[in-house]
Curated annotation (Swiss-Prot):
Catalytic residues (UniProt): D12, D131
Pfam family, one: His_biosynth
A GO BP entry: L-histidine biosynthetic process
GO cellular component, one term: cytoplasm
Name of this chain's protein: Imidazole glycerol phosphate synthase subunit HisF
Pathway: Amino-acid biosynthesis; L-histidine biosynthesis; L-histidine from 5-phospho-alpha-D-ribose 1-diphosphate: step 5/9
PANTHER family: IMIDAZOLE GLYCEROL PHOSPHATE SYNTHASE HISHF, IMIDAZOLE GLYCEROL PHOSPHATE SYNTHASE SUBUNIT HISF/H IGP SYNTHASE SUBUNIT HISF/H
Provenance organism: Agrobacterium fabrum (strain C58 / ATCC 33970) (Agrobacterium tumefaciens (strain C58))
HAMAP family per UniProt: HisF (MF_01013)
EC number: 4.3.2.10
Similarity annotation: Belongs to the HisA/HisF family.
Highest classification ranks of the organism: Bacteria, Pseudomonadati, Pseudomonadota, Alphaproteobacteria, Hyphomicrobiales
Location(s), subcellular: Cytoplasm
Catalytic activity: 5-[(5-phospho-1-deoxy-D-ribulos-1-ylimino)methylamino]-1-(5-phospho-beta-D-ribosyl)imidazole-4-carboxamide + L-glutamine = D-erythro-1-(imidazol-4-yl)glycerol 3-phosphate + 5-amino-1-(5-phospho-beta-D-ribosyl)imidazole-4-carboxamide + L-glutamate + H(+)
Swiss-Prot/TrEMBL keywords: Amino-acid biosynthesis, Cytoplasm, Histidine biosynthesis, Lyase
Gene that produces this protein: hisF
Length: 258
């Protein structure tokens, strides 16, 4: 049986509201993440990713409320990331209805945290989110470095080596974002995605840079990703989930089309 590729819209949530805007027709409140989630669920998204970018830990309770209300209304799996620093954070998100929890900076700071989380909750619900920038110069072998704290802090850590280490620690999935491409609409960094996907035995989600439906196809066909994440092309109604799935299927990618 061929593993079907997944399309995952991503919503950035700050203080309980969607930021970067969502332009859905017929949505009463496009800033409400639960309304946006319901629209994506109805449109046939395979999964949804919430990224909590709330700056202060005082407002963390809002994301728990968002996840809980989304779980009440939606059937698609939901991954939640942003500010996950402890086993208690993961437990609370899972209890609220998240299917998977994404760990970013905390995994860089303490790789054993990933092992503890996977041991306690199972590999299948632990995603490690990798934000990487290309640091190799022209003519050099490709090399990417991990950045943390929303891409502001270089770590000196090689992204591909780190990805392998995270899977060894128990990550069940990797979310790989190219910081060079993020928001540019110039397509995924295929070299980055493929370099990681070819080295690990877990699903890899390509992220950062989608501008066209061809970019989604390339993420799977050329980048060897098992899932493709996008934000603005769906949020602003450039393409629908249905159009994206049909296009990918027409280009030879196995998709769930029901």
């Amino acid at each position: 049986m061929t593993l079907k590729a997944r399309i995952i819209p991503c919503l950035d949530v700050k203080d309980g509201r969607v930021v970067k805007g969502v332009n859905f027709v017929d949505l009463i409140d496009a800033g409400d993440p639960v309304e946006a989630a319901k629209a994506y669920d109805a449109a046939g998204a395979d999964e949804l990713c919430f990224l909590d970018i709330t700056a202060s830990s005082d407002n963390r309770d809002t994301i728990f409320d968002v996840v809980s209300r989304t779980a009440d209304h939606c059937f698609m799996p939901v991954t939640v990331g942003g500010g996950v620093r402890s086993v208690a954070d993961i437990r609370k998100l899972l209890l609220c209805g998240a299917d998977k929890v994404s760990i970013n900076s905390a995994a860089v700071k303490d790789p054993d945290f990933v092992a503890q989380a996977a041991d306690k909750f199972g590999n299948q619900c632990i995603v490690v989110s990798i934000d990487a920038k290309r640091v190799s110069k022209d003519g050099e072998a490709d090399r990417w470095e991990i950045f943390t704290h929303g891409g502001r802090q270089p770590t000196g850590i090689d992204a591909v080596e780190f990805a392998i280490k995270m899977v060894e620690r128990g990550a069940g999935e990797l979310l790989v974002t190219s910081m060079d491409r993020d928001g540019t609409k110039s397509g995924y960094d295929i070299g980055l995605t493929r370099s990681i996907a070819d080295q690990v035995r877990v699903p890899v989600i390509a992220s950062g840079g989608v501008g066209t439906l061809d970019d989604l196809v390339a993420g799977v066909r050329d980048g060897h990703a098992t899932a493709v994440l996008a934000a603005s092309i769906f949020h602003f109604g450039t393409y629908s989930i249905g159009e994206a799935k049909s296009y990918m299927a027409e280009h030879g990618i196995a998709m769930r089309l029901d």
